[in-house]
Amino acid sequence: LSLVGSEMCIRDRGGYHEREIEEYGKKRILQILSMKDRIAVFAIMNVVDRHLQKRYIRTTGASIKRRGTHDLMNRIRTDLQKDPEGTLYAYKFDICRFYDNVRQDFVMWCFRRVFKDERLLVLLERFVTLLPEGISFGLRSSQGAGNLLLSVFLDHYLKDKYGVRYYYRYCDDGLVLGKSKAELWKIRDVIHGQMEKIDLEIKPNERVFPVEEGIDFLGYVIRPNYVRLRKRIKQKFARKMHEVKSRKRRRELIASFYGMT
């Protein structure tokens, strides 16, 4: 009950402020809740996420406990090494302004397929409808909402209906491996069709290319025999190290960098 009372202020008093950040060259607006609301959202989503994670395919990695970029990158490398003939080509895509363009009614439809408790659904709807359109980039619940939406309308559709063997997703970035360009262009058309159903679009920078060029994904350039960090990540690290004077912050940056390597 105390959590329910706490969550009321998210909508009733507009209890958040906004801050602009820059991430991977993109400017984003974060909605930041009061500490009281953040604790409430975190507690509720800890329970919700445990139920959602059982429904995700194994090759999606964003904001999922015991997964992440390393886990997904290693799975891609393993598949490249185990089936070189079946992974000669790659199709890489990115959903256009995903959080901004997500339809709130589709997200709630997905939540209602999983949860039947009306009190919980009322809270989830408050999280989802924090903004007039889209879902909040900064809200803890949006990670689960986005993953669930794409799990229902894309991940399981590709894996279960079309039997796509080598498909990987990290948030709104996707990768498919295949034995031919023709195979991947067909899968590309299926992905576009699914995104149109939920009013989302794939960015025009999508491409099909030979794996031997290297797969620029998850902050790495991935090849069957080796992986290296993306060049601009190394440049960003060097720039930050030059700018930061605090010894403690330098140690944090170094730990973060070596965590990626």
Residues covered by each model-derived region:
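Single conserved hydrophobic/aromatic residue that forms the stacking wall/gate
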Residues: 1-5, 10
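Inter-domain linker/hinge segments that demarcate the starts of reverse transcriptase
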Residues: 7, 187-198
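Short, conserved non-catalytic motifs in the polymerase core
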Residues: 14-41, 55-67, 127-148
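Short Gly/Ser/Thr- and Asp/Glu-enriched loop/turn motifs at secondary-structure junctions
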Residues: 14-16, 168-172, 204-205
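Right-hand nucleic-acid polymerase module
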Residues: 33, 38, 42, 127-130, ...
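Active-site-proximal segment of RNA-dependent polymerases
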Residues: 41, 45-103
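Active-site palm subdomain of RNA-directed nucleic acid polymerases
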Residues: 44-58, 113-124, 143-190
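A short alpha/beta connector and helix-capping loop motif
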Residues: 103-115
